[in-house]
Amino acid sequence: MIGWLQGERIQSWEQGGRRGVVVACGGVGYEVQLTSRDQNGQGTGSACTLWVHQVQRDDGSTLFGFCDQQERDLFRTLIGVNGVGPQMALALLDCCRVHELVAAIVDGDLKRLTQAQGVGKRTAERIAVELRDRLGNWAPLQEPSLSLVDRSDVKAIPLGEPCLRDLQITLETLGYEDLEIRRAMRAVASGPDVPAEDDGDAWLRASLKWLSQSA
């Protein structure tokens, strides 16, 4: 099985919605399917290093390539979920960067997961249920520690930055973890009675209520 390739990128290709490159290694050209992000990352004639997952079938084999080993490892984890094939796993990684996809799975963010081509709500739910615990402890794939005000999934929540910082400090002092706080805030923001953006006390009460009910 091929797990890693290093050579020269001699051609880019697209066919039927799929895309990739041909990598010349030791006089042999390997056709490798990539995400659109990785395909656009380098030009023809440039040096190319890819972590590879090989899928073997009766009619031949397909190579899926990734610029980062963690991305390749997450791809392998995704195809272990019932109903998730290599093309769907690649679509998920094309839609989100590694730490974003891990966060979406751990958070059960179905809206984010279903943005990937071919991923419906039921499949997104299955991915979240089967992988949440496994990826929650997968430290290398988690987003670097950030303040809530810097989190992309929190920026759209209608709460002023000073109140947001105070809310984070208070909930962390009470023993809640980052993921729990983010889930609570998104739940409150999508609920029927969203507190005013400058009413930190109301946000705290609503968040604590949601956290107690979800425990």
From Swiss-Prot:
Major location (coarse): cytoplasm
Cellular compartment(s): Cytoplasm
Region (Flexible linker): 147-158
One annotated GO molecular function: four-way junction helicase activity
Region Domain III, residue ranges: 159-215
Keywords per UniProt: Cytoplasm, DNA damage, DNA recombination, DNA repair, DNA-binding
GO annotation, cellular component aspect: cytoplasm; Holliday junction helicase complex; Holliday junction resolvase complex
Region (Domain II): 68-146
Gene Ontology biological process terms, A to Z: DNA recombination; DNA repair
Region called Domain I, residue ranges: 1-67
Transmembrane segments: none
Assembly and binders: Homotetramer. Forms an RuvA(8)-RuvB(12)-Holliday junction (HJ) complex. HJ DNA is sandwiched between 2 RuvA tetramers; dsDNA enters through RuvA and exits via RuvB. An RuvB hexamer assembles on each DNA strand where it exits the tetramer. Each RuvB hexamer is contacted by two RuvA subunits (via domain III) on 2 adjacent RuvB subunits; this complex drives branch migration. In the full resolvosome a probable DNA-RuvA(4)-RuvB(12)-RuvC(2) complex forms which resolves the HJ.
Domain statement: Has three domains with a flexible linker between the domains II and III and assumes an 'L' shape. Domain III is highly mobile and contacts RuvB.
The family this protein is said to belong to: Belongs to the RuvA family.
Function of the protein: The RuvA-RuvB-RuvC complex processes Holliday junction (HJ) DNA during genetic recombination and DNA repair, while the RuvA-RuvB complex plays an important role in the rescue of blocked DNA replication forks via replication fork reversal (RFR). RuvA specifically binds to HJ cruciform DNA, conferring on it an open structure. The RuvB hexamer acts as an ATP-dependent pump, pulling dsDNA into and through the RuvAB complex. HJ branch migration allows RuvC to scan DNA until it finds its consensus sequence, where it cleaves and resolves the cruciform DNA.
HAMAP family cross-referenced by the UniProt entry: DNA_HJ_migration_RuvA
Protein name according to UniProt: Holliday junction branch migration complex subunit RuvA
Gene field: ruvA
